[in-house]
Amino acid sequence: MLSRLSAVWRPSRVALRIQRVDFTTCGNRLNRSTQPNEPPLVSGIAARSRTAKAEPVEKRGRAAIKIDSPPPPLEPPRISEEHMTRRRKVGGGKTKAAAVTKSKQRRSGRTVGASAFNTARRANGIEGSAPGKGGASDVAIDDDDDEKLVDEESKQLMQLLKEEALRREEEKKKRLRAKAAAEPTEVTDDKEYLSKLGVAERTQPVGTEAKISAQGKAEGASEGQTHFSDADADSQLPILTSLSPEQQRALRLALKGRNLFITGGAGSGKSLLIREIVYQLRHNKRRCVYVTATTGVAALNVRGSTVNSFAGVKFGDGDARQLLKWVRRSRRAAGRWRYCQTLIIDEISMMDPLLLDKLDVIARAIRRRNEPFGGIQVILCGDFLQLPPIPPRNKPQQKTEENAEAQEGGDPTDGTPAPSKLQYCFETSTWTSLNLITVILHKKFRQHDDLAFQQVLDELRVGSLSPESYELLLSRTVASKSSAKSRKKKDEDAGNDGVLPLTDAETTPAAAEKDRHVRLCATNKEVEMRNAKYFAALEPKGLPIYPSPNDGSSQQTGSSNGANSVTEEDTMRPLQVYRAYDAYSTHETEPETTEETTTGTQPSQPWVRFEDSTLPTDLALKVGTRVMVLQNISLRLGLVNGSVGEVVGFLHPLELVELVLRAPRERHFPSARGQELLERAGLPTLQDAFRCVDTALGQSLFYYLRERGIRRPEDASYGCVYGNTHCRDILRLVGLGKTESANAVHPLEMYLGGIAPQHVRLTRLPIVRLDLREGNHTSSDSGAVEDGGFANGSKRLPKHVYAFISPSSHQWYMGDQPVATRTQLPLRQAWAMTVHKAQGLTISHVEVAIHRFFSPGQAYVALSRSTRLDNIRLLDFNNASVHACPRAKEFYTVLEEEELDNEIEDDGTEGDEEALEGDGEYEGEVEE
């Protein structure tokens, strides 16, 4: 009996095993025999895998199994070897976390991505698809067909983006290799320097602080840099070839250990020079460099911290002795002062002069060296003719020029004002003791195409306009509604036949919506009112109701349509709300913080103010919202930080992938799904979808997918296109990051068909239409395009570029260690913004209500954001609105006279380019 059961069981078990064999191998073995009279070439275990009828027979007294003639062989599923090769290539490399999640779900009776996988198999023709119904043989698209789809403008644009992305990737690899090669030497040099300094034997906390500093460097090196955009990475690269002669002179002096004061007008490249100095000092000289600034906005621009946080003096209140006690109680603050070798302070013009004297006293006491700043190399950067210093908390800010002059008091002929009368840092005794070498940057990079505008800005900077410059600014004046009637009546009475002002272009919200100018205001209240006015006029009507940080509910809109109601209006013209995700970096001695902290800051890092970031805390977007892009997309195309565009639609990342991959198959007969995606994205044609730039990838998504061999929407998972970090950031921005559970599908396993519809709707990202500048409409590259086959010469580019905006991050640094991070879409509403927020940006079209400015230099900062005079619009301009501080003007007059003498003296002591080659002995010069 047992033998009979065994005989029946064995063939069945073999047949089950054969069913698990790869379909391609089974098909090749079964289909070798094509003639009916030819015996099948199947042997061994494969022959026994056929379905057969078993009959018991007698053999040697035992029951056996007699196998009749087998039925015709099974027809293998129709599947191409090319598809299987591509699936193995794209689907391989699952992470360990994905494997663990998949194993848990299998044990619980679920299969990861089963529905999406079956959908993909049916769409690929695996499960008996009929010819002409979407099978694999009918929809295969080769490279030649792709080339025919894309026009020449799109090809040229995609090629430029590809070359720029490859260049960034190659430079990033070089930077990582150089950093890895320099790490062991850097530790050795630090130990040697600390032994020379001889402070470890005098103070007990130094050894502990050195250990913590080394651990902090290791943690900073291990921090994930995935949040950095390509523009942030480019800012850390050596750029010696792009520096002007004045900038190269400042770099040589900095590498020789001199104390510097770098100044110049707006757009002269001060921030660019600071980044290059930091890069050279850290990588070539192995120096411990701390980059600081007087404001949080300026600190983010130079990737540093505020000077108050570095010094450990909180708000800087109190006398020097009280601040010194605070610093000595903070082990970290004291350690920063001891090990700092180069201190860079940006926007020195906005620092309280008394604070500079206090910092000098603290540095001398902590370092126990009776030298200016305890022997630290000090590099100051700023322009005293721009925004004035920030007053202390117990002093009101100056409102008018008359109040400023009244507060100055005293005899203007005195060389040294009383301490209570100090207004700028150059009036302090510490400034004189530093023996700063002044480097004035004269070349303007921002307005290099408009020489007349440069002359106007130079005169506006010192507060004295010539008649020609005044007429040029008056020609850009627009009368506001409140003063249009009074000005018209005044001109009629006076018979004024002078320059006629421009017409008011923003009489209605609809007209303002089409306008490209960004209003620069003096206060936050004006900005909020203007942005809310025009945002509420868009469809759907109303303003968003932002949820509290502790509220786990989804975003609600100000209209009747809630976040959970799915209507046609919500789908095509939605109201999307994104809340920034703020987090602190972990440290061994500090509690780990990885949750949202938008309502406050940690006591251990009170200096971090997330509202200082240009990335907004809450970002509400509709179709038609005017936005400003806060990261560089393409330097060659002029799509840089500060470019203004308009939101035209919203798509989920995988929906955009589906749209791009559907286009080749639906170029003749578009489907309803393809038309729906094209309409939801706000793209007029398929060519616009081809050249849509993904900010996460840095190039055209169509080009990127073609290089990866991804041709079908069913083959594109989230992991093979974007990755885990991209998905995690999006979920956090829409409030879904905390809903992850053990049974959730891993982001690398997600296909579009496996995501819940409500999650697809909430996690859609904006598509922004950006206008190329007039100088970027053509490309005159000498090299031929590889794939496109273009000849040498100019090629015309499209006037509009569409960008798919992905999350980005701003980081706060203490030295070279990131301490806090804000993640948000690099966009902000751009109907209006404050002058302080616009500092450091390049805005193409600017509108300025100059009659409302109250601080000296505020009008100059606002107008210098633009690149051309023709792109400026002034409201109620008059000559009284332009003024500069008399003390600052006198200071720069002296600097201009001494500049020539300093250059002659420096030329006699500098010698050759030894500093750039790294041959000089930097440490000896500083310590002596």
Curated annotation (Swiss-Prot):
Family: Belongs to the helicase family. PIF1 subfamily.
Gene3D superfamilies cross-referenced by the UniProt entry: P-loop containing nucleotide triphosphate hydrolases
Enzyme class label: isomerase
DNA-binding region coordinates: 858-877
Organism: Trypanosoma brucei brucei (strain 927/4 GUTat10.1)
Keywords attached to this entry: ATP-binding, DNA damage, DNA recombination, DNA repair, DNA-binding, Helicase, Hydrolase, Isomerase, Mitochondrion, Nucleotide-binding, Transit peptide
Keyword Ubl conjugation listed: no
Targeting signal (transit peptide) range: 1-49
Cofactors (names): Mg(2+)
Sequence positions that bind ATP: 264-271
Gene: PIF5
Record's protein name: ATP-dependent DNA helicase PIF5
